[in-house]
A protein has these predicted regions:
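Transmembrane beta-barrel domains of Gram-negative outer membranes and organellar outer membranes
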Residues: 23-201, 205-339
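Bacterial Sec-dependent N-terminal signal peptides
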Residues: 1-28
């Protein structure tokens, strides 16, 4: 039991040490309009909402199929405890066209939640790069490619699919979702995000998928992306190829749009989406005082003084001391008798 407690303490210390490096950015860092997810968290004190209104349309297949959907995606992201640990909630509400094709073709519509997933991701490795702007002696070294950029930052993802969804999406059980999130910053304008997921584990609807997204920034406000998502299921494989634009309206709001070509089993179709991402920024930077050797100074003369002055009774009695000091005494007047 003691060994277990020691191991837990060591693990918590290790995680706390890793979390000292911040994930907060001055501008919003949204996953939209792509389907992939960055390994970086939003940072403590950030409450971020990423929305997407979408329309999907494919050809009707024999027997039962879902050829059309109109819906709304929402991803909520925040961080409470550690800078590198993010908690998120993914949900989707949509109206689906359910079609039956045999001798005759018929259809009906179904509305409700198609997804409600609670998840968390933790950045286990963050790749650092050389600052080439400080290289002034060699033009070649200043503009040479940094091969460290081929090494990605890595995060692990763990989620739980709830079964609080509409009837056509129910799996009759709660199922886990696990994944690995990678990001390579090839330059200051180009990055590649790769996701590998194993979803709905332990159910008849389990699936394995990967997403590869390339993003390029035209300016500080405009960016574009290309993306390939492939999903392997027991009954069929789905592929979608997408592209789109994102516009940074201000530090806390991003607008985005996307278009996709779909291959779902033996049928094809298209997908279009428009979304808004915004955040509530309550982040506060934390600072540490270091000595000449880079070690943290736990107590400084100022902190010691604050501790002495910070006691309840010291503050309580200081009120009366201040009153005594500020209280003036009227001079006594002496009356003299007139002779």
């Amino acid at each position: 039991m003691k060994k277990l407690v020691v191991k837990c303490c060591v693990f918590l210390f290790f995680v706390s040490y890793l979390s000292s490096y911040g994930q907060y950015t001055e501008v919003i860092n949204s996953n939209k309009p792509g389907f992939s997810e960055s390994p970086y968290s939003v940072g403590k004190g950030i409450y971020q909402f990423e929305s997407n209104l979408f329309f999907r349309n494919t050809y009707i297949e024999p027997t039962f199929s879902r050829p059309q959907s109109l819906g709304f995606d929402l991803l909520f992201r925040t961080s409470f405890f550690l800078e590198k640990l993010e908690l998120n909630l993914q949900t989707s509400y949509q109206r689906d066209k359910i079609a039956f094709k045999n001798i005759f073709t018929s259809h009906y519509f179904s509305s409700g939640l198609s997804k409600l997933t609670l998840g968390a991701k933790y950045l286990v490795y963050e790749q650092e790069y050389d600052d080439k702007s400080k290289e002034v002696r060699s033009w070649k070294k200043r503009h040479a490619f940094d091969y460290k950029r081929l090494i990605p930052s890595v995060a692990i993802y763990v989620g739980m699919n709830t079964d609080f969804v509409s009837e056509i999406y129910k799996t009759r059980s709660i199922s886990p979702k696990i994944g690995v999130l990678l990001q390579q910053n090839l330059s200051t304008k180009t990055n590649v995000v790769t996701n590998i997921f194993y979803d709905r584990l332990g159910t008849d609807f389990s699936e394995f998928s990967y997403i590869i997204t390339g993003t390029y920034n035209f300016t500080d406000r405009w960016s574009t992306f290309i993306e390939n998502q492939t999903i392997f299921q027991k009954t069929q494989n789905n592929i979608n190829l997408g592209t789109g634009l994102a516009f940074l309206y201000n530090n806390n709001i991003q607008l985005n749009s996307s278009a996709r070509f779909l291959v779902e089993g033996e049928t094809t179709g298209f997908y279009a989406g428009f979304g808004v991402s915004f955040r509530i920024d309550k982040h506060k930077d934390t600072f540490k005082v270091l000595d000449d050797k880079g070690r943290e100074i736990k107590e400084t003369p100022i902190s010691k003084y604050d501790k002495k002055q910070g006691g309840f009774f010291n503050r309580f009695f200081s009120i009366f001391k201040k009153k005594d000091k500020n209280r003036g005494t009227r001079p006594k007047r002496s009356r003299k008798k007139k002779n």
